[in-house]
């Protein structure tokens, strides 16, 4: 789910506050806009896999394992070291494919809030410059990638070892602050 809102701040000429401010004060404090974008996702679904030899005898390597129980841990039992119950998945026996479905496991959610403060400074009729301050991941909330899903890796399956590293809109890494100025004529 994504939310997007644009708020014109109530300062400066024609606004609720400082509507009669002198020209220079109005030019500096009036006309600012705040843009807020929020991305929220409860789960990132993923599939368990195995990388053993070819049990189905179809010249393939790995695939979906057999699912012997749910595999999703209650949210209170999930940790970065044990996100899902790996004992619920086993490599299929010789002669057939695994019975696990695709995307049957719930990964970590996503909560990212981005804000932009912007203002256009009109210098004359043909010349102005724009100022923008962007803050990605305002609350610095960690957004984890899906855990390792290969049940053939001893001690590795179910472990979350990474976050979304770089800022890219809805896949924000740590908080990022950026300022831009653009002159238009």
Predicted feature locations:
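Short, solvent-exposed micro-motifs at the edges of structured domains
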Residues: 1-185
């Amino acid at each position: 789910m994504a939310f997007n809102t644009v708020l014109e701040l109530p300062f400066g000429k024609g606004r609720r506050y400082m509507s009669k401010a002198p020209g220079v004060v109005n030019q500096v404090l009036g006309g600012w806009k705040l843009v807020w974008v929020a991305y929220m996702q409860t789960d990132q679904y993923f599939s368990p896999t195995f990388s053993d030899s070819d049990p189905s005898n179809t010249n393939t390597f790995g695939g979906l394992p057999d699912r012997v129980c749910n595999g999703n841990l209650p949210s209170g039992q999930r940790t970065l070291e044990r996100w899902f119950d790996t004992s619920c998945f086993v490599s299929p026996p010789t002669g057939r494919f695994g019975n696990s479905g695709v995307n049957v496991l719930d990964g970590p959610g996503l909560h990212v809030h981005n804000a932009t403060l912007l203002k256009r400074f009109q210098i004359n009729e043909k010349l102005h410059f724009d100022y923008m301050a962007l803050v990605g991941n305002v609350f610095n909330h960690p957004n984890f990638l899906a855990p390792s899903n290969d049940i053939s890796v001893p001690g590795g399956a179910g472990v979350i070892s990474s976050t979304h590293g770089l800022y890219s809109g809805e896949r924000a890494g740590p908080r990022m602050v950026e300022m831009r100025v653009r002159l238009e004529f």
